[in-house]
């Protein structure tokens, strides 16, 4: 079903649906490991890719196909691939496009496990990795080499919400025709930002977050052009990682996407109100949010994003000790990692999600010991603020 001319909410609900034998409104969960062939000849044709059809759920499943079609439509890309986690999506993609002797340019500020993969994983297998500030385009330009195969980044970045000009960066990266630009779009989602429309080659997601939105699934997604998607599916996913998403989990995300647009509207609206509260609070030292005019990436965010998101990071006067006091005294906000859930989540990046960094690496990346990260949920905003207020009073 072609939905590219429809609104985002309509696309999230209707795109990629498959007709099934019984005409069910909800997508069936095809809970099977393998699929029966009509004949030996048909099995041979499918393995030879001469005939479309399912073989084995690691290679594809009807429930998962619907999810893949939906994310491709939402990102306005040619093809999607579902994986068992965000790290599965990132790893499968990188193991497909990289080989020993290749070079990667990436940002100093990344999700902790992505940083560990770049800093300790890829380098074990002969891939050179250079860390730069990708918001500084001169640094990107100076880091590029003849063997640069990938430029990888997040925008907004986790956890300090740094913004990168995707269109300008893609133009620099593509001066080398062999370089692929890969962007983690988890924080922005296709509700706010569509990197493929700005020159990016591959988009990755932790679908655990806003796309599912209910905190009950671990999943990853990749969107790119068809040729690359086929390579990632049949090399990175099939042979290198085996990070296959089960049909049950795919179903949960398909269901979550039915409310995707209205959830994102509420997330962002709540966040704007909370930013205003935090920015005026006497115990808050600094607020990091791309919707603030004082944010260094504000103009770029305004240009390439529809809204500014629902992730807020802030530093308290009193540093980490003040942060611990706040975290330990909240009653409504949940002290938990992850993000994009219906519940408001709060955590301490330096000791939690970004603990793979050394203290020195965190300082270079702008992840201070006093930084607190807030994922704004869907509760009534006055209740979230009241909880933050009473927690801040304890400092």
UniProtKB/Swiss-Prot annotation:
Q: Which organism is it from?
A: Fusobacterium nucleatum subsp. nucleatum (strain ATCC 25586 / DSM 15643 / BCRC 10681 / CIP 101130 / JCM 8532 / KCTC 2640 / LMG 13131 / VPI 4355)
Pfam families per the UniProt record, alphabetical? Cys_Met_Meta_PP
Q: Which residues bind substrate?
A: 111, 373
The subunit structure is: Homotetramer.
**This enzyme's EC code(s):** 4.4.1.11, 4.4.1.2, 4.4.1.28
Provide the protein name: L-methionine gamma-lyase
Q: Decide whether keyword Lyase is in the record.
A: yes
Top-level class of the enzyme under EC nomenclature: lyase
């Amino acid at each position: 079903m072609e939905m590219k001319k429809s609104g985002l909410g309509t696309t999230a609900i209707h795109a990629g649906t498959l007709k099934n034998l019984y005409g069910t409104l909800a997508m069936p969960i095809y809970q099977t490991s393998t699929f029966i062939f009509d004949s030996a000849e048909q099995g041979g044709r499918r393995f030879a890719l001469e005939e479309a059809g399912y073989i084995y759920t690691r290679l594809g499943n009807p429930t998962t196909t619907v999810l893949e079609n939906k994310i491709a439509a939402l990102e306005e890309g040619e093809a999607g691939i579902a994986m068992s986690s965000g790290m599965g999506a990132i790893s499968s993609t990188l193991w497909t496009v990289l080989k020993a002797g290749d070079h990667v340019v990436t940002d100093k500020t990344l999700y902790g496990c992505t940083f560990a993969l770049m800093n300790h994983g890829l380098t074990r297998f002969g891939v050179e990795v250079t860390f730069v500030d990708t918001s500084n385009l001169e640094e990107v330009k100076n880091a590029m080499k003849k063997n640069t195969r990938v430029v990888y980044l997040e925008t907004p970045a986790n956890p300090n919400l740094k913004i990168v000009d995707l269109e300008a960066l893609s133009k620099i990266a593509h001066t080398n025709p062999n370089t692929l630009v890969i962007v983690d779009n988890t924080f922005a989602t296709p509700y706010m930002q569509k990197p493929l429309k700005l020159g990016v080659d591959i988009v990755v997601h932790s679908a655990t977050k806003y796309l599912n939105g209910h905190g009950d699934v671990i999943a990853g997604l990749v969107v790119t052009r068809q040729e690359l998607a086929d390579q990632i599916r049949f090399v990175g996913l099939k042979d290198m990682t085996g990070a296959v998403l089960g049909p049950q989990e795919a179903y949960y995300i398909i269901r979550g996407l039915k409310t995707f647009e209205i959830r994102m509207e509420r997330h962002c609206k709540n966040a704007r109100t909370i930013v205003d509260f935090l920015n005026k609070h006497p115990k808050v030292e600094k607020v990091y949010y791309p919707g603030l005019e004082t944010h260094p990436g504000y103009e770029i965010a305004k240009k390439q994003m529809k809204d500014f998101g629902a992730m807020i990071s802030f530093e308290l006067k009193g540093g980490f000790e003040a942060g611990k006091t706040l975290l330990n005294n909240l009653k409504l906000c949940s002290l938990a990692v992850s993000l994009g859930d219906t519940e408001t989540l709060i955590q301490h990046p330096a000791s939690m999600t970004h603990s793979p960094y050394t203290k020195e690496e965190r300082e270079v990346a702008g992840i201070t010991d006093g930084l607190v990260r807030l994922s704004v949920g869907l509760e009534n905003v006055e209740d979230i603020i009241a909880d933050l207020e009473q927690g801040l009073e304890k400092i």
